[in-house]
C-alpha cells in the first residue's frame, strides 16, 4: 500500500538523520522536566467543558475528583473523598471529604466547593452556568440536587438509582475546579485553570505548549518532577522527529510503523495497555442514502476491517463487533460476530435500496484522541466502498474544528464521519450517542440522528439497575439491536500505546486512557 510504504520511508529517513546527527545536548530537556508530545492543541483546560482524551491527559494532572480509577484498572478508589456510603435504595450517595486540602489558589476544598462544581454544570440558573457549555453534564443527569451537609460531608440526591455514578465521578468530567477561580475567570476560566492536583498551571502558549509545575503541597505527596510541558504536535512525523532529536521524553499514540522502527533505534521503551476503545463511522440516518438501513448494513459488509487492523493499524487493534468494547468483559456479548467482509452482499443490499453508485461525503479528522491513523484509514475505506460502486469524497479538518463540526450533527455537512471514543462504563457511549434524547439539538452526541424507542428504554433500564448481571443482559440486548440497525460502521478496538525515552521512570499507561504523571521521574543524564 502506498500510504504504508510512504510512512515507513519517512520513518526510515528520520532514523537515519537521527543516527547521523550529533546527540542532543544534555541540557536540552532538564532532568526534572518531562516533555510530552500530544496529538493536538487542547480546546480548554476546564474539565467540565471538554470531551477529548487529548485534553483529559493534561487535566488529570491539574485536578482531582472525589474518586479515581485505581492504577492499572477501572476499579474505583478514594481521592478527594476518603469514603462514601450508598443508601439501600441507591438514590443517596454521602461522601466524607479529605481534611486540609487546598486548591492551587489557596482557597479551601470543602463540601461547598463540590456543590458549586455540580450545580454549575447542572443548574441553568447557577450564576456561573454561562461559563459552559458542559457537553458531558449528561454523566450526572440523574443527580436531583447536591447538599453540603457540613464542611466535610457532601450528599448527592438522585432522581433514581444510577449505577454508573461512581465511575463517572472518576472520569475527568468529575474533576473538581476552584469556585473562586471560576468566579474570577468567567468564560476565560479554561485558560486559567485551578485545581487541587499534583501539578499547578503555569502557562499556555497557543499551538506551542502548556506548562504545569510541581505542587509542593499536594495531599498525596509532591511529584518528583519540577514541571511537565505538553506540546501539541499534530503531525506524526514531527512528533517522531522531536522524540529522536531529544526534544520529547514521552510520545502518545505512536503510529504502528514508528513503533517498530523506534524499537530498532534503541534508547526507547514501548508502553501498551488494552482499554475500552471503539473506532467507528457515524452514519447520517436523517438524510441521504443512510436513511435506509440496507445501505447502512451494506457499508458494514463492504469495509474490509481485517485488512484495516492488520494493514493500516499493523495489528495494534482488533475488529470491533458492537457498541460495547470487549474490554468490558462483564457486559460484552461474546456471541456477537463482526460484520464479515462480503462485497457481494453489500452490492445486493445497495441494489435493493436503489443506492447503487451513490455519492457520499466523508468527514475525516487530520488527527485526534484515539483516532489512530485517520487519513490512511479513510483512504482505505474509500477504496473499499469504491469496489461496491460508491463514490466517496473525503474532506479533512483540524481536530478541534472537526469536533465542533461533527458534534453539532451531520445534517447538511456530510454522510458519514470518523469517530473514536474511550469510555469508562458500558453506559457511556450508547447513552451519549444513540438515544433519541441525545440528539445534537438537545446537547447530546447523537450526530447521526439514530432513534429507536426500544434502545431508549433498554439504556434507561440498564443505568437504573443496581444488579450487575441484569445490567449486562440489558447491554447485550442493546448490542444485538444496534448491530442490526447499523447506525454506525463498527471498525476497530485499539490497544493504546506510548513511547518514552529510557530515562523516564515510573510511567504506566492506564486502561482509562488517561495520563497520570504524579509518580513519574527522569534519570539524570
Feature annotation, model-predicted:
Residues 190, 215-261:
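Ligand-site clamp/hinge motif
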Residues 319-352, 369-376:
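Structural transition elements
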